[in-house]
Curated annotation (Swiss-Prot):
The gene is NAT1. GO terms for biological process: xenobiotic metabolic process. One of its GO terms (cellular component) is cytosol. Changing D251V: In allele NAT1*22. It is found in: Cytoplasm. It catalyses: an arylamine + acetyl-CoA = an N-acetylarylamine + CoA. This is Arylamine N-acetyltransferase 1. The active site is at C68 (acyl-thioester intermediate), H107, D122. SUPFAM superfamilies: Cysteine proteinases. GO terms for molecular function: arylamine N-acetyltransferase activity.
Length: 290
């Protein structure tokens, strides 16, 4: 595996001599705009592999994306290779319908320490929940970013990531009540502890998430990619583009239903993905918002 090939894949051309917050932010932003958050392997009949060599091959050599366990594993390797002090952490994702956090540790995120300060770095949540900058590990502080205002809160050794969202405008009235729309203005995202993890800690959950009928990842095919002003999402046959804060503290969300023939073109033109096997788009009933 070659760090230069990774940096070329994400389009990062600047110096990486300084292990500072600016460099870390730049690498994160390049990755989230180049590497989609996606689970298309499952819906092409392939496995979502946790091995670093397999992830490198998929993302760097074959120009694909992956889900959190893959893209954040790759980012962990890249940041560590560059010289950042990086730790894997495990997260518990909030379920809006159940009104509780997952019992299983289903999310991989990173902690990076720079000059004695700790930051949360996550390139693998996608959609309008994706951080664009590292979050300083401070409890109760609002941290405004382009997508929203993020807030970390600590209680009894558990940390909670929440977001304060804008209003949203959907010009196509056909989609005003889409099940993909987020209703909450204040949204809980996930919880985590600062206990260091290894990729082996996620192996059983990686299998469960891609095989269980109750998993959102088997229920829906999706692909999400950040842009300089928003985010593209493809869920099943539904394509959306969200423009953050297009006016008056409001996000603009445009919807389009694609035909099967259009999906291949959209994957290539918007997400820069060419699949080797046939995708079977799926929009099941598990809760998933953009």
């Amino acid at each position: 595996m070659d760090i230069e090939a990774y940096l070329e894949r994400i389009g990062y051309k600047k110096s990486r001599n300084k292990l500072d917050l600016e460099t870390l932010t730049d690498i994160l932003q390049h990755q989230i705009r180049a590497v989609p958050f996606e689970n298309l392997n499952i819906h092409c009949g392939d496995a979502m592999d946790l091995g670093l060599e397999a992830i490198f091959d998929q993302v760097v050599r074959r120009n694909r994306g992956g889900w959190c366990l893959q893209v954040n594993h790759l980012l962990y390797w890249a940041l560590t290779t560059i010289g950042f002090e990086t730790t894997m952490l495990g997260g518990y994702v909030y379920s809006t319908p159940a009104k509780k956090y997952s019992t299983g540790m289903i999310h991989l995120l990173l902690q990076v320490t720079i000059d004695g300060r700790n930051y949360i770095v996550d390139a693998g949540f996608g959609r309008s929940y994706q951080m664009w900058q590292p979050l300083e590990l401070i409890s109760g502080k609002d941290q405004p970013q382009v997508p929203c205002v993020f807030r970390l809160t600590e209680e009894n050794g558990f940390w909670y990531l929440d977001q304060i969202r804008r209003e949203q405008y959907i010009p196509n009235e056909e989609f005003l009540h889409s099940d993909l729309l987020e209703d909450s203005k204040y949204r809980k995202i996930y919880s985590f502890t600062l206990k260091p993890r290894t990729i082996e800690d996620f192996e059983s959950m990686n299998t469960y998430l891609q095989t269980s009928p109750s998993s959102v990842f088997t229920s829906k095919s999706f692909c999400s990619l950040q842009t300089p002003d928003g985010v593209h999402c493809l869920v099943g046959f539904t394509l959306t583009h969200r423009r953050f804060n297009y006016k008056d503290n409001t996000d603009l969300i445009e919807f389009k239903t694609l035909s099967e023939e259009e999906i291949e073109k959209v994957l290539k033109n918007i997400f820069n993905i060419s699949l080797q096997r046939k995708l079977v788009p799926k929009h099941g009933d598990r809760f998933f918002t953009i």
